[in-house]
């Protein structure tokens, strides 16, 4: 359950930012999740709520946005957002070098591909109360 570890990092980063800004409370934040990251949103929300108890983050509104996965072809430069199934998504999360096993460039047929977007997790907005 890597959602708990992710939530710990997010809570720690948000609390640190709140301290630096002199905030009494963090009222709202938006997390952007890459769709290839393989994060279960409801588990992440649960972990965030639990880890926020008794902190300036408790009760904050949590908004989650998804970033579509994007793949780029090193051969012709074409970029697209492929449709991948859950098995492929999980494999790509842990071993992105397996991308050529699942996809070919729809323009030139190359397997020389790279993930250009849809990986990672970041706080994309934050509202504080001072």
Please name every model-derived segment.
Residues 1-28, 36-52, 56-130:
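N-terminal, polar/charged subdomain of small-to-medium soluble alpha/beta proteins
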